[in-house]
Amino acid sequence: QSDKILLYGNCNIDEANKLSEYLKTTSNIDLAFEINDEANLLFSKYPIIFLCGNSYLKLSETHIQELNRMILNGSLLLIDNYKSDYTLSIFLKKLLAEYPERNNSISEVLKNNHYKVNFEQIQFKTKQVYISEKLRVFALKNESIFDSELNDDNNLRLASSIIFNYLIGN
């Protein structure tokens, strides 16, 4: 399995490459990350899209509409290291008004926990949006999924589990 993942915003490419290597080693999934700037941003090339930091606040109406189409057609949006519940809620309502945000625990999000990690002990703060009971938006607050130094690589396990579950159709 080989897919490209878009990194948009202030994403750490070195840590993204660690995530790629982690997935390849643990799941035999080969992923390539691609950084793209706003000038030539095209969401339709990517099944998985990372928006890092507050980059979601900088998206144009056109980008939001394209992102909406991609998510409704099955893409996965990961919002990494967002800061404000208020601005994220406004963005999610604009992006997917007909689908409510949820605050499920990580164990609920990852019913198929490939790495058998007890995420409840780690206390990630997240929001999600589901379409037909499939995770389509996952947002991590005040932490970066790419920071493998935190939590003894549990951030990598979290990201790997989300991507793995998405790729196998869960």
List the predicted regions and their residue ranges.
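An acidic, glycine-rich "communication" segment
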Residues: 16-17, 84-163, 167
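Short, well-ordered loop/turn elements at secondary-structure boundaries
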Residues: 45, 72-73, 131-133
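Surface-exposed patches in mature extracellular/periplasmic domains of secreted proteins
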Residues: 29-37, 79-82, 101-109
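Surface-exposed charge patches
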Residues: 21, 68-69, 94
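Short alpha-beta junction capping motif
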Residues: 48-89
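Aromatic-Pro/Gly-enriched surface loop or interdomain linker
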Residues: 1-48, 52-55, 144-146, 152-170
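Alpha-helical scaffolding within the catalytic cores
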Residues: 34-39, 60-66, 121-126
